[in-house]
């Protein structure tokens, strides 16, 4: 066991493997599984209507920069997007800047908690303003701004919206440089993200391709 702080995802790893039949594989088992994602307001699930079907279809929950830009500037009836920062003052708790910043609750609890509360308030205000696509972004991370752990931001907002009765009115999109492993994406999707733009992972792949490494 490591005595070093870990990314939040690592604390969710299980000590066993569960085999599924059929495999959860939308490529080889496309008849029974799919990776399609839908963005938009679901409305009242107990009273379905035509408006509940007004959604944008994505073939994969992982999207690139162009798709994210299109979603941010969507100009269709029934759709309105906004970007919400998931950052907090590093002086209030980030032990180091960047996407591997470790948050020590003994030091950063108040700063991190305040940032989460602000995120929830911003989301509630956006929903009241008619927004139905919330884009959580850590794009402006820097020396003075540390990112809220993406899994914490997504899961926290998801459960907050459930408690407010507004979760089915919005979709949660994550724009983050933090996730890069299969487990990261699985956890984020499982805890409430509808789409993920892993911009740093995508830029890393592009850089490796340009150098001829892959």
Language model: regions and residue ranges:
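Extended, highly charged accessory segments
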Residues: 1-89, 94, 100-104, 111-118, ...
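Glycine-rich phosphate/ribose-binding loops and adjacent secondary-structure elements
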Residues: 85-94, 99, 103-214
């Amino acid at each position: 066991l490591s005595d070093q702080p870990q990314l939040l995802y690592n604390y969710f790893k299980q000590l066993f493997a569960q085999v599924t039949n059929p495999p959860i594989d939308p490529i080889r088992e496309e008849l029974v599984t799919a990776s399609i994602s839908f963005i938009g307001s679901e409305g009242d699930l107990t009273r379905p209507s035509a408006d509940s079907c007004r959604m944008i279809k994505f073939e994969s929950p992982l999207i690139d920069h162009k798709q994210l830009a299109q979603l941010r500037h969507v100009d269709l009836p029934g759709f309105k997007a906004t970007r919400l920062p998931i950052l907090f003052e590093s002086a209030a708790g980030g032990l180091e800047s960047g996407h591997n910043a470790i948050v020590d609750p003994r030091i950063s609890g108040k700063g991190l908690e305040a940032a989460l509360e602000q995120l929830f308030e911003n989301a509630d205000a956006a929903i009241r303003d008619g927004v139905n696509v919330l884009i959580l972004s850590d794009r402006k991370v820097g020396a003075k701004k540390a990112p809220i752990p993406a899994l914490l931001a997504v899961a926290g907002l998801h459960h907050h919206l459930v408690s407010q009765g507004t979760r089915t009115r919005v979709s949660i999109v994550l724009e983050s440089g933090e996730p890069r492993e299969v487990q990261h994406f699985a956890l984020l999707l499982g805890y409430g993200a509808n789409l993920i733009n892993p911009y740093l992972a995508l830029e890393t792949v592009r850089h490796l391709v340009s150098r001829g490494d892959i």
